């Protein structure tokens, strides 16, 4: 097998059950061209390793100061009441010296370079569980197809060992990158965030045109696809958008999807935004969980009435 560039991975989760069938090992790759306001993984945005600051874990400047002593830049580490609270990101060279010096995990590293074989060593640990549960490997992100060459080689390695593969992708990439991985991909999970290109751009910073075109191409190739809608209050949960989404699935995709999954908005990841010095734009969004779940269930019933197999959550039944 030809050598591929290493993958930049920020998390590997074992025994996941939400992104594909059975028990799975899920790899999360760095880098994403979208900036969805509700994203729970802001550490996935940038395509390189970076650090986050967790001030509650800081020992204190007086007792330690290892980060300050090793940082090659001057005055970019910000301390409040003796504890590290933030980093001036525009002056940071991302050398990771502060993380390497920190003895208390107050400076957390997100992103690690891993070869295909290093990933396979992790994946093989649970091969027996995949076989018994009908599971396998899922690669997510971020946008994993920004590292499509790595994903293709990883999926080739999985296939050679009889391990099922699943790709979770926004599909906001050139079609060529999708084609790179298709021969080795058993299942694709993607989502439709909004049908209106301007509203889509308002909340994700990109248009939906490329995404929808790639979905059409995938269904034309008779690919195994699970579609999702992250249901965000007052963003995409109105009937105008829901009806437009159903029309697209039926008319443009020919209804050729395995399942449509509606995922309820959850306020997750706020602590990570703070650690990265980023604003969390959903901070003031308040949801009555019971009434919102009823609303989502009503939306699922609408899709099912239109002949689209739809469920609430990540299961398929």
Curated annotation (Swiss-Prot):
S-adenosyl-L-methionine binds at residues 38-40, 142, 191-193. [4Fe-4S] cluster 3 binds at residues 71, 92, 95, 98. It holds the Pfam family Radical_SAM. [4Fe-4S] cluster 1 binds at residues 32, 36, 39. This is (2S)-3-sulfopropanediol dehydratase activating enzyme. Its EC number is 1.97.1.-. One of its GO terms (molecular function) is metal ion binding. It comes from Klebsiella oxytoca. It comes from the Bacteria. Binds 3 [4Fe-4S] clusters. One cluster is coordinated with 3 cysteines and an exchangeable S-adenosyl-L-methionine. Residues 49-82, 83-112 form the 4Fe-4S ferredoxin-type domain. Coiled coil: none annotated. One of its GO terms (biological process) is alkanesulfonate catabolic process. InterPro entries: 4Fe4S_Fe-S-bd, 4Fe4S_Fe_S_CS, Aldolase_TIM, BssD/PflA/YjjW, Organic_radical-activating, Organic_radical_activase, Radical_activat_CS, rSAM. It is an enzyme of class 1 (oxidoreductase). Pathway: Organosulfur degradation; alkanesulfonate degradation. Keywords: 4Fe-4S, Iron, Iron-sulfur, Metal-binding, Oxidoreductase, Repeat, S-adenosyl-L-methionine. [4Fe-4S] cluster 2 binds at residues 58, 64, 67, 102. Residues 18-306 form the Radical SAM core domain. Belongs to the organic radical-activating enzymes family. Involved in the degradation of the organosulfur compound 2(S)-dihydroxypropanesulfonate (DHPS). Catalyzes activation of the (2S)-3-sulfopropanediol dehydratase HpfG under anaerobic conditions by generation of an organic free radical on a glycine residue. Gene3D superfamilies: 3.30.70.20, Aldolase class I. Its cofactor is [4Fe-4S] cluster. It catalyses: glycyl-[protein] + reduced [flavodoxin] + S-adenosyl-L-methionine = glycin-2-yl radical-[protein] + semiquinone [flavodoxin] + 5'-deoxyadenosine + L-methionine + H(+).
